[in-house]
């Protein structure tokens, strides 16, 4: 216990009191609204603080997890042993003629609207994606025929040796829901976007149209992590799930949405185990019916209860 207190004391030397919390329910920090407690939640306000936190974790042999706004995250019911480093306070935004520099904690929807306000086109597709910039660039988030990779010029990262460096587009190895950042477990700090000048009214109309389509077709009224599964090559996950007769299928408080089969939702006070059991059931059913493997798009971390 003294060892843990020493670790907390070392963190509190440079992390503001309000940005350092003990024994925090992760369900309050994920869009699924499930998950057990994390031992320590820390919210750095400067890039340099991240390195210092990681150095302390290594010194005291403490696990750490990098999280954004938790919109693509499922934390198991036993929670997280160690430290969750939440990057949402790294949210500076600079807008130039056709460039935007965004901190990793900037919400994507906010970024999309700011681009619209400056008559910059290229980020309309991101208007309804609930993630933040750091997670979005790491997984090359996309929707409605748009992807983050189409508009990224460079990303400032912390590499796995703790060094800060800038990766340019050709070094980022973007693929479907993947990048060099994800592959090498780098931490995305700041992204430079290159956009095009456009007609503000057309940009606004496109955003309005995409938001309307989202509201009509997605179960936004329930907690979820967006699309639960990646798109398998040559197929659509939602169609495979629906054709397997799983639309509306529930386990505990979790359900395959009857509005969009690609979403597993927290319909009625689900546990993480309910959601994980339903994910496994869907994967097994689709595999047995169509011989197609469904890989999860959502990131799953933590311990079972």
From Swiss-Prot:
Query: What residues make up the catalytic site?
Result: 177, 227, 297
Output the Gene Ontology terms for molecular function. Answer: FAD binding; UDP-N-acetylmuramate dehydrogenase activity
Query: Ranges for the FAD-binding PCMH-type domain?
Result: 33-198
Record's superkingdom? Bacteria
Q: Does the keyword Thylakoid apply?
A: no
Which controlled-vocabulary keywords does the entry list? Answer: Cell cycle, Cell division, Cell shape, Cell wall biogenesis/degradation, Cytoplasm, FAD, Flavoprotein, NADP, Oxidoreductase, Peptidoglycan synthesis
Q: Which HAMAP family match?
A: MurB (MF_00037)
Protein's name according to its UniProt entry: UDP-N-acetylenolpyruvoylglucosamine reductase
The scientific name of the source species is: Clostridium acetobutylicum (strain ATCC 824 / DSM 792 / JCM 1419 / IAM 19013 / LMG 5710 / NBRC 13948 / NRRL B-527 / VKM B-1787 / 2291 / W)
**Gene behind this protein:** murB
């Amino acid at each position: 216990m003294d060892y843990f207190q020493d670790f907390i004391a070392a963190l509190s030397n440079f992390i503001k009191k309000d940005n350092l919390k003990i024994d925090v329910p992760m369900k309050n920090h994920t869009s699924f609204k499930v998950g057990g407690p994390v031992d320590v939640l820390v919210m750095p306000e400067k890039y340099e603080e991240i390195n210092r936190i990681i150095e302390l974790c290594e010194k005291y042999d403490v696990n750490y997890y990098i999280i954004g706004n938790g919109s693509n995250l499922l934390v198991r019911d036993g929670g997280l042993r160690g430290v969750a480093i939440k990057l949402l306070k790294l949210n500076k935004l600079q807008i130039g003629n056709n460039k935007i520099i965004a901190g990793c904690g900037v919400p994507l929807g906010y970024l999309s609207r700011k681009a619209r306000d400056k008559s910059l086109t290229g980020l309309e597709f991101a208007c309804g994606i609930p993630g933040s910039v750091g997670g979005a660039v790491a997984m090359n988030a996309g929707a409605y025929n748009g992807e983050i990779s189409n508009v990224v010029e460079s990303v400032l990262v912390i590499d796995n040796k703790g060094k800060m460096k800038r990766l340019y587009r050709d070094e980022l190895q973007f693929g479907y829901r993947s990048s060099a950042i994800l592959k090498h477990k780098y931490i995305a700090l700041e992204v430079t976007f290159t956009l095009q000048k456009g007609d503000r009214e057309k940009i606004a109309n496109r955003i309005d149209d995409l938001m309307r389509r989202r509201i009509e077709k997605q179960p936004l009224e329930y907690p979820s992590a967006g699309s639960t599964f990646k798109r398998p090559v040559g197929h659509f996950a939602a169609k495979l799930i629906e054709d397997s007769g799983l639309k509306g299928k529930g386990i505990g408080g979790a359900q395959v949405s009857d509005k969009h089969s690609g979403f597993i939702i927290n319909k009625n006070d689900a546990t993480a185990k309910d959601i994980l059991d339903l994910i496994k059931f869907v994967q097994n059913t689709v595999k047995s019916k169509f011989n197609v493997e469904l890989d999860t798009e959502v990131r799953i971390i933590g311990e079972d209860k």
